[in-house]
Amino acid sequence: GGACDPMSEPTRTLPGTGSIEVIVGSMYSGKTEELIRRLRRAQIARQRVEIFKPTLDDRYAKDAIVSHSELRIPSRSVKNAAEVLKHAHEAQVIGIDEGQFLGAGLVDVCEKLARMGKRVIVAGLDQDYRARPFEPMPQLLAIAEYITNTLAICVVCGAPANRTYRKVQRGGRVVVGGT
């Protein structure tokens, strides 16, 4: 266990124990920005950090996670969750952006890493543009020790927004980019 204040880092009471932190919300809600903030703090604390993103996410850079506000941190592109496991052995902290694109194996990989004593932080969409669960994020939420739910701002009325609004009617469930 530990404490989690929305404006601070989750803290663990037992040193060396692993944990899973999940950051979810709609598009433009600051998920990646929060992930980068936590990973930078871990780096400042001289912890070994490995950062991953799906190869599908090539919006800003192939070798970095980049927020919409253009914060960036170097990362490794992976095709699936199993590749995360291959490259995470030396790390104390593992960051994963756009977790919804890494498939059902993400849940098992995160559990394995946490059992190895690692702090695992995953950011991603928990719902698609139709407000339906975006697998595997709901399963990850079910096992997470710490959950942060971010809110966007509606550009029409200025109210907090918890849904992704799709502006284009093309494509399937996944359309990469700011649409």
Where are the predicted features?
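Walker B beta-strand of ABC/ABC-like P-loop ATPase nucleotide-binding domains
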Residues: 94-95
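Helix C-cap/helix->beta junction micro-motif
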Residues: 45, 116-117
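Conserved GTP-binding G-domain of TRAFAC-class P-loop NTPases and closely related GTPase folds
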Residues: 139-179
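Conserved ATPase-coupling elements of RecA-like P-loop NTPase cores
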Residues: 98-113, 127-134
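Catalytic-core regions built around general acid/base machinery
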Residues: 38, 109-116, 136-143
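Short, Lys/Arg-enriched N-terminal segments with co-localized hydrophobic residues
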Residues: 1-6
